[in-house]
Amino acid sequence: MLQPKRTKFRKMHKGRNRGLAFGANVSFGLFGLKAIDRGRLTARQIESARRAITRYIKRQGKIWIRVFPDKPITQKPLEVRMGKGKGNVEYWVALIQPGKILYEMDGVSEEESREAFKLAAAKLPIKTTFVTKMVM
């Protein structure tokens, strides 16, 4: 699963997830899966959606993952009293704003990529839509 190799600090503040997305255009492939909602994608969810796409297109075409989980989420163990410091890092998330391109695909037909992204979207906790590259 995806996670940073090294970070400057082990733990992070919760923070807020406001604003609009950077990376809102299809850059590498012809088709993309675009986020409509804001939310958090865990490394497991990103990997699960990637597997759904690759299983459907069966080694043809190319896929780009445009999100990376770089925020650590901590949890304290069950039945532990309040206080005594921040919990341990349990998993990593990517913060998603509306408009962010999550996945891109090239080398397959539009119908196949639509169906593959539909399968991937079922694995994700946010609403998404299918987009194509804008050619000027």
From Swiss-Prot:
Keywords: Ribonucleoprotein, Ribosomal protein, RNA-binding, rRNA-binding, tRNA-binding. The keyword Coiled coil does not apply. InterPro entries: Ribosomal_uL16, Ribosomal_uL16_bact-type, Ribosomal_uL16_CS, Ribosomal_uL16_dom, Ribosomal_uL16_sf. SUPFAM superfamilies: Ribosomal protein L16p/L10e. One of its GO terms (molecular function) is tRNA binding. One of its GO terms (cellular component) is cytosolic large ribosomal subunit. GO terms for biological process: translation. It comes from the Bacteria. Belongs to the universal ribosomal protein uL16 family. PANTHER family: 50S/60S RIBOSOMAL PROTEIN L16, LARGE RIBOSOMAL SUBUNIT PROTEIN UL16M. Binds 23S rRNA and is also seen to make contacts with the A and possibly P site tRNAs. Part of the 50S ribosomal subunit. This is Large ribosomal subunit protein uL16. It comes from Buchnera aphidicola subsp. Schizaphis graminum (strain Sg).
